[in-house]
């Protein structure tokens, strides 16, 4: 079953085999946080299907194939509905831009598309408020495709009457991730494959066929090289690169506590905690226990419909849902608290990105200010400022 077939199902029987983590009210000192929507970026005829923060810019991908760059400085102005007159817009492929990632130096943007392709873009700094974006490559590249056509056994059966080389995705590319050293790009697809690309020349190094039994919806990478993939088959699989062969990954674990398809993943910075969002509205919390293996320690419940996206900033977890809300969670020891429910979208929240607000005067050793960007099927992007005491 593809994500679109089950994404918005509402089931209150959420991952019933996993106990709920503490749902008690937050400690008194955490009750003094506040949040507000500081801007709404009005959409036109397409919804935002993906977004990523890249330095001083918010990069968004839409359901009508557009990639748009907007200066974060323009969003900090006192304007609840900022103009998009100065946005940089490019269009590529057919259908939605399913996922976006940026390099650590913010010079590369990589986009995943519904037309089965991956595209690489170069960002050049023009001024404080403007960037120039250039299309560098479409994956698989022409040279890679030509070489594979000449190689024996490079063509595989993808449908009853269709063959193609193993470097091609044959369905929507649903998620992307860069390795810590940014030498490898990982892509997953509704075609159930996990592919690995070398970023120096964007050659496809490896393709794991049938990595799952259904569409793969999300991917997350830890600093130690573990690769987590999540699927509509209800499973999360863990892959590790073999030390003897940097090109080859092997399955090292399968996490099977979800009762419904898994749509989203997020890892804490130290890689010790993994969050997974299910179509039943539950968020499972996985923690590395003795022996170095992930174990489910509980579930966060509160959303009434599918979890569609997750993000982590410091100790905070942000979750976007088909119930049109974003929730903010914080873990304290082994307990978790829902600190806020952000309401205002008129459609499912499809994608989110959060970041520490370095420019806020409210940041102290006892408080944290974050900016959260949420994209919805209502075609709007909302910008939220969140102040939370520690």
PLM region descriptions:
Residues 1-57, 68, 76-77, 126-166, ...:
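Intrinsically disordered, low-complexity acidic/Ser/Thr/Pro-rich linker and tail segments
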Residues 34, 41-48, 90-97, 141-147, ...:
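WD40/WD-repeat beta-propeller blade N-cap
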Residues 36-39, 78, 85-88, 134-137, ...:
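A structural motif specific to WD40 beta-propellers
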Residues 51-56, 101-106, 177-183, 219-225, ...:
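Loop/turn segments within WD40 beta-propeller blades
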Residues 61-64, 112-115, 188-191, 229-235, ...:
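Conserved strand-to-loop turn within each blade of WD40 beta-propeller repeats
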Residues 67-71, 118-122, 188, 194-198, ...:
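WD40-repeat beta-propellers
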Residues 73-78, 122-131, 240-246, 287-292, ...:
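Short loop/turn segments immediately following beta-strands, especially the blade-tip
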Residues 350-355, 360-390:
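Blade-level signature of beta-propeller repeat domains, shared across WD40, Kelch, NHL, RCC1
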């Amino acid at each position: 079953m593809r994500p679109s077939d089950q994404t918005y199902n509402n089931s209150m029987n959420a991952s019933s085999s996993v106990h709920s983590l503490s749902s008690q009210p937050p400690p008194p000192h955490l009750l003094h946080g506040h949040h507000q929507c500081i801007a709404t970026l009005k959409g036109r005829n397409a919804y935002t299907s993906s977004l990523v923060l890249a330095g001083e810019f918010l990069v968004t991908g839409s359901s009508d194939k557009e990639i748009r760059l907007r200066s974060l400085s323009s969003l900090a102005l006192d304007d609840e509905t900022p103009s998009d007159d100065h946005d940089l817009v490019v269009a590529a492929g057919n259908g939605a831009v399913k996922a976006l990632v940026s390099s650590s130096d913010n010079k590369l943007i990589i986009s995943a598309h519904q037309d089965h392709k991956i595209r690489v873009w170069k960002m050049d700094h023009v001024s404080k408020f403007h960037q120039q974006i250039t299309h560098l490559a479409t994956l698989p590249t022409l040279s890679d495709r030509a070489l594979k056509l000449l190689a024996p056994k490079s063509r595989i059966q993808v449908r009853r009457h269709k063959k193609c080389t193993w470097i091609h995705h044959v369905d929507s590319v649903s998620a992307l991730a860069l390795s810590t050293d940014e030498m490898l790009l990982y892509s997953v697809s509704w075609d159930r494959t996990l592919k690995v690309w070398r970023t120096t020349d964007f050659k496809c190094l490896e393709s794991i066929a049938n990595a799952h039994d259904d569409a793969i919806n999300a991917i997350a990478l830890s600093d130690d090289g573990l690769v987590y993939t999540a699927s509509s088959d209800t499973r999360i699989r863990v892959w590790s690169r073999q030390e003897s062969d940097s090109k080859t990954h092997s399955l090292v674990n399968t996490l099977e506590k979800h009762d419904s398809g898994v749509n989203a993943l997020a890892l804490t910075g130290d890689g010790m905690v993994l969050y997974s969002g299910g179509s039943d509205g539950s968020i499972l919390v996985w923690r590395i226990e003795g022996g170095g293996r992930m174990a489910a320690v509980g579930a966060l419940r509160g959303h009434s419909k599918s979890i569609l996206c997750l993000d982590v900033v410091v100790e905070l977890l942000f979750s976007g849902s088909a119930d049109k809300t974003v929730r903010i969670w914080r873990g304290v020891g082994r307990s978790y608290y829902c600190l806020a429910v952000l309401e205002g979208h008129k459609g499912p929240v499809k994608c989110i990105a959060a970041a520490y607000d370095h420019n806020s005067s409210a940041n102290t050793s006892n408080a944290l200010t974050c900016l959260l960007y949420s994209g919805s099927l209502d075609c709007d992007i909302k910008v939220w400022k969140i102040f939370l005491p520690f």
